[in-house]
């Protein structure tokens, strides 16, 4: 059965196509079910004999495989481009490798083309397009009878226009045919309401060239020294602290939903392997790992989706479009700090399932960009961003008494610090895994605090 928004959006798209209007753009929050929407529209177009074939393009093999499965189920046929199939799911990268015969053959058919996460393709014309955008503009755009472009995060970090998107003038705001926001999705119980925990530290010290500097926050340290954010996310004790929070929260959720899982987004393969070791050896967790260096990552993701393993550690393999509804906890330790990536990662824990306990928790460090992104996850709702007292390291429920919140105009900070905690850089000889000297001799993190941002409070 379709969700209400999927029904309304599909009806609107079909009305537009029936009027011979070629293009439809849908912006729907990550985790809302855009693939099911696209498959439904494709099914209706085939049923009404408005198209003969369906092509889907997406940014990764993981997403492409998910699309293939959803379309096969919805259309009740194979969706691999072979005999008896009505279409195929491909990656944007594969477009440039398809033969001329492939494109010539398609010209004999009416083709419905679905562009998933279209923001990966930039350019309003060939001159300002990226490689994927050029392929869409030169090989796909004119071929398609109808197109459906979809994105949960319809903007680009480089501020270039998205392929086939329309913008108003003069402010350049994206024009969409249908929009389904996170606020709407949470109200409809389509997505979980997220809680974001920003871990900061009040007594940091950086020792470099026999000079000791002290700072009251991660933000202050990063601004006033050459220490990089990577130094924080690669610090052994810092990793252990964030993972400890994640493990305790996952354990709490699994008391109610035994199949709940956690995702750790790492910055490199070495980082992911270190994180896996910590989770296994220090916290006795069961862990899967998927990176471009590991064999059969798609199979590993599928195994994790179906089994009861507690954690999956990923480097770029599980971000946008990856459908694992049992994920309810995320530890964000990636060095990528763009709002696009942040929201896509958050989207991995927002998909609802049949569990009665639909919490979603993201843990990360209080870095400047991440603070900003977290604060505006849902900035239009009053009292949506608050400081929350952490009752203990085990119980991470935010302090949310409505009569208390109503007394504050914007933010209320309720701090609870844990003293006598020192995170030291334990890497031998102050070298990183690549053998290069660190930017500092020692990083110590003492008293720390946690800030919780609870979005979409009722």
Model feature map: region roles:
Residues 19-41:
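Walker A/P-loop
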Residues 68-106:
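Inter-Walker segment of RecA-like/P-loop motor cores
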Residues 286-390:
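Conserved RecA-like P-loop NTPase helicase motor core
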Residues 233-234, 238-241, 249, 369-458:
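Long, largely alpha-helical accessory region at the distal end of helicase-like NTP-driven motors
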Residues 35-45, 50-72, 267-270:
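Conserved Walker A/P-loop ATP-binding site and its immediately adjacent core
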Residues 159-258:
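Interdomain helical connector at the RecA1-RecA2 junction of SF1/SF2 helicase-like NTPases
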Residues 104-148:
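SF2 helicase catalytic motif II
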């Amino acid at each position: 059965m379709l969700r209400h928004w999927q029904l309304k959006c599909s009806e609107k798209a079909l009305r537009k196509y029936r009027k011979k209007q070629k293009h439809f753009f849908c912006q729907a929050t990550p985790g809302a079910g855009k693939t099911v929407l696209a498959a439904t529209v494709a099914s209706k177009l085939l049923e009404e004999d408005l198209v003969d074939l369906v092509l889907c393009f997406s940014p990764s093999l993981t997403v492409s495989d998910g699309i293939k499965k959803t379309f096969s189920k919805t259309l009740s046929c194979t969706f691999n481009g072979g005999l008896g199939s009505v279409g195929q799911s491909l990656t944007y990268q594969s477009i440039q490798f398809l033969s001329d015969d492939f494109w010539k053959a398609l010209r004999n058919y009416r083709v419905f083309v679905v562009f998933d996460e279209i923001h990966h393709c930039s350019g309003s014309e060939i001159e300002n397009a990226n490689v994927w955008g050029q392929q869409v503009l030169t090989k796909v755009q004119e071929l398609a009878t109808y197109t459906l472009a979809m994105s949960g995060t319809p903007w680009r970090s480089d501020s270039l226009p998205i392929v086939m998107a329309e913008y108003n003038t003069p402010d350049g705001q994206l024009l969409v045919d249908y929009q389904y926001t996170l606020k709407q999705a949470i109200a409809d119980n389509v997505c979980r309401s997220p809680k974001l925990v920003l871990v900061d530290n009040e007594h940091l010290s950086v020792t470099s060239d026999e000079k000791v500097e002290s700072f009251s926050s991660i933000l202050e340290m990063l601004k006033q020294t050459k220490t990089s954010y990577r130094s924080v996310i690669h610090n052994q004790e810092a990793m252990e602290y964030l993972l400890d929070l994640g493990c305790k929260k996952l354990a709490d959720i699994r008391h109610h939903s035994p199949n709940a899982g956690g995702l750790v987004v790492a910055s490199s393969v070495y980082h992911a392997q270190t994180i896996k070791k910590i989770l296994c050896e220090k916290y006795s967790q069961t862990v899967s790992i998927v990176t471009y260096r590991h064999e059969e990552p798609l199979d590993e993701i599928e195994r994790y989706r179906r089994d009861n393993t507690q954690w999956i550690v990923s480097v770029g393999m599980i971000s946008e479009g990856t459908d694992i509804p049992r994920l309810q906890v995320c530890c964000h330790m990636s060095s990528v700090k763009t709002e696009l990536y942040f929201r896509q990662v958050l989207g991995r824990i927002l998909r609802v399932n049949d569990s009665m306990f639909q919490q979603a928790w993201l843990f990360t460090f209080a870095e400047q960009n991440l603070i900003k992104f977290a604060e505006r996850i849902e900035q239009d709702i009053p009292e949506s961003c608050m400081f929350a007292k952490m009752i203990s390291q085990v119980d991470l429920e935010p302090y949310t008494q409505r009569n208390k919140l109503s007394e504050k105009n914007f933010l209320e900070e309720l701090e609870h610090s844990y003293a006598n905690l020192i995170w030291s850089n334990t890497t031998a000889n102050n070298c990183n895994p690549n053998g290069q000297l660190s930017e500092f001799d020692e990083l110590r993190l003492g008293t720390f605090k946690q800030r919780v941002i609870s979005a979409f409070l009722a």
